[in-house]
Structure formats: structure tokens, C-alpha cells
């Protein structure tokens, strides 16, 4: 209960305020919820243990949390950089994405799962040279999203 009161509630309250402020200021918002995932699905992580993951999994909860043009933009940027990308499989998006995604109100929320093999040795947890390339990819993605029109 302590962690919920001290961490969960304040975090979600701050995120709610940030999303609302961005939507008021810009007429819409594009929220990207980033996570890391192992190169291969673990026994308890998904319904598909042993499944090799692509470089990225985009989750829009089957199109309910972001407009198609926003999801397509993210996929296009990542594939243009040579990455493998899956949509909603095996991760559709978590509660934060559901809570903040409402495309009819120009509020787009996507979960972005990033394969750890892109930036670290999973066995040692040491970063490797791929982390610089990943940083550049993420910079390009953020720039593309900054120029996207959430109200389209």
C-alpha cells in the first residue's frame, strides 16, 4: 500500500496533468509509453514462451488508443531504419495506453516495446555499441512525432 500511495498515485497524477496540459496547449497529444523486452519471450512473460521478439512491438490495443496515421508513422520510421516491427503481438499495450488513448479526442497513446538486444548484452546487462544507433533511431522517431498532426 505504501508504494501505491507514494509512487503509483503521484506518478499517474503527474502523467494525467502532463497529458491534459499538452492536449490543451496543442489541441491533441501523442503519448509514447516505452518499455524494454527480452530478445526471446520468457515462460511467464506472454502466451508465447520462446518466441523471438522483433526489434520493436507497437501496441495500440488493436487500434483503440491511436489513430491509424499515428501508428503507421511510428512503424514507418522504425522500418525505414531497417528494424523489424510487429503491431499488437505479443504486446497490445498496458493500462497507461488505454487510459490516455482516445483518438476521437485527438489523444493518441502507443506502447513501444524495445528489444534489449538492440542496446545491451542481456546476459551481462552491459550496454553495447548498438545503443548509439538505437538512440539515433529514437531521436528520429521523436522528431517525426513532433511534426505529426495529432488532430488530423
Question: Where are each of the predicted segments found?
Answer:
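Aromatic/hydrophobic pocket-lining residues that form the small-molecule binding cavity
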Residues: 8-11, 15, 134, 138
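Catalytic cores of processing enzymes, dominated by hydrolases/peptidases
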Residues: 10-120
Amino acid at each position: 500500500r505504501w508504494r501505491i500511495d507514494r509512487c503509483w498515485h503521484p506518478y499517474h497524477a503527474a502523467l494525467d496533468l502532463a497529458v491534459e496540459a499538452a492536449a490543451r496547449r496543442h489541441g491533441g497529444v501523442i503519448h509514447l509509453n516505452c518499455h524494454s523486452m527480452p530478445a526471446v519471450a520468457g515462460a511467464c512473460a506472454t502466451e508465447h514462451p520462446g518466441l523471438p521478439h522483433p526489434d520493436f512491438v507497437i501496441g495500440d490495443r488493436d487500434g483503440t488508443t491511436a489513430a491509424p496515421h499515428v501508428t503507421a508513422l511510428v512503424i514507418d520510421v522504425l522500418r525505414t531504419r531497417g528494424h523489424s516491427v510487429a503491431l499488437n503481438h505479443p504486446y497490445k499495450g498496458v493500462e497507461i495506453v488505454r487510459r490516455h488513448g482516445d483518438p476521437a479526442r485527438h489523444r493518441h497513446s502507443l506502447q513501444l516495446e524495445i528489444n534489449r538486444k538492440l542496446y545491451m548484452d542481456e546476459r551481462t546487462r552491459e550496454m553495447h555499441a548498438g545503443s548509439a544507433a538505437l538512440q539515433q533511431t529514437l531521436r528520429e522517431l521523436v522528431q517525426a512525432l513532433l511534426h505529426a498532426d495529432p488532430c488530423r
